[in-house]
């Protein structure tokens, strides 16, 4: 009996070693707004990397420069903080500095369904530990300026990406909840993850679709916690009360919030194995 038990244990250990599935762990950080948002990334990213053993960090940076686009210096600063890929959105061209460096920015992705004449690129591929992840940025068309069909562009780029690796991450920068959910279902089993950005409010619908695509309608914002979508309360309230023009400003001081989305992806199949919303501020402190 003793010999049998030893053999049985050895057999089970071998069996489970063969069953171990390697995964890529990806952290996506929601729309970084202004200096408060950048400070939140610098403050919490090292802790998040340690807690989740992150392989790749993606962040939406279209509001990183005082809410209006991104600059070369901010792009470089975010990379130095540990962000691997930066996605954009409808504010891509707000800061004219971007035209001077976007074509040379290897890890900056603007919406792929912008005009064919637009500089920059709509997909980048990054390799970590011998595994390649493709990151695609798309722009919605409902309640936003018109662009090319994001559904068709997604299919085209995913087919191209999967020739290299089945791991594909999509940031869909869109306004309408229905449009985001529709793309999520449309790409189920084709993309590893589809995350929504733009509205700056994190949604409570993180899930993995039946064919292995992790999804959340909006990751939320990383920026000023006590303001309105990252803009000063007073300017927004004034506009609602008076229906008069009001210049929205991003505060430089105040409490911060970091919103994120964590997903584990099977390196062999490209399917999501787990996902989790991340929301950190003084009311919901980081749990290390």
Residue ranges and their predicted role:
Residues 20-288:
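Acidic, metal/ion-coordinating pockets
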């Amino acid at each position: 009996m003793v010999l049998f038990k030893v053999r049985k244990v050895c057999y089970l250990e071998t069996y489970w070693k063969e069953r171990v599935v390697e995964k890529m762990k990806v952290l996506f950080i929601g729309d970084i707004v202004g200096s408060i948002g950048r400070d939140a990334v610098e403050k919490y990213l090292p802790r998040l990397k340690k807690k989740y053993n992150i392989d790749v960090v993606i962040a939406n940076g279209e509001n990183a420069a005082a809410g209006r686009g991104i600059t070369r210096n901010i792009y470089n600063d975010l990379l130095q903080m540990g962000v691997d890929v930066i996605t954009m959105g409808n504010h891509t061209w707000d800061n004219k500095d971007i035209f001077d460096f976007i074509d040379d920015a290897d890890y900056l992705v603007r919406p792929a369904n912008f005009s064919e004449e637009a500089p920059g690129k709509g997909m980048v591929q990054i390799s970590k530990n011998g595994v390649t992840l493709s990151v695609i940025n798309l722009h919605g068309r409902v309640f936003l300026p018109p662009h090319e069909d994001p559904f068709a562009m997604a299919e085209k780029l995913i087919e191209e990406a999967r020739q290299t690796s089945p791991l594909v991450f999509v940031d869909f920068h869109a306004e309408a909840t229905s449009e985001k959910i529709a793309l999520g279902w449309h790409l189920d089993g084709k993309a590893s993850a589809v995350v929504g950005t733009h509205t700056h409010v994190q949604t409570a619908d993180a899930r993995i679709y039946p064919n292995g695509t992790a999804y959340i309608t909006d990751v939320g914002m990383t920026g000023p916690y006590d303001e309105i979508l990252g803009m000063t309360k007073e300017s927004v309230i004034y506009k609602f009360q008076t229906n008069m023009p009001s210049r929205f400003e991003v505060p430089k001081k105040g409490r911060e919030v970091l919103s994120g989305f964590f997903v584990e992806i099977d390196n062999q199949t490209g399917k999501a194995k787990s996902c989790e919303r991340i929301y950190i501020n003084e009311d919901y402190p980081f749990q290390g």
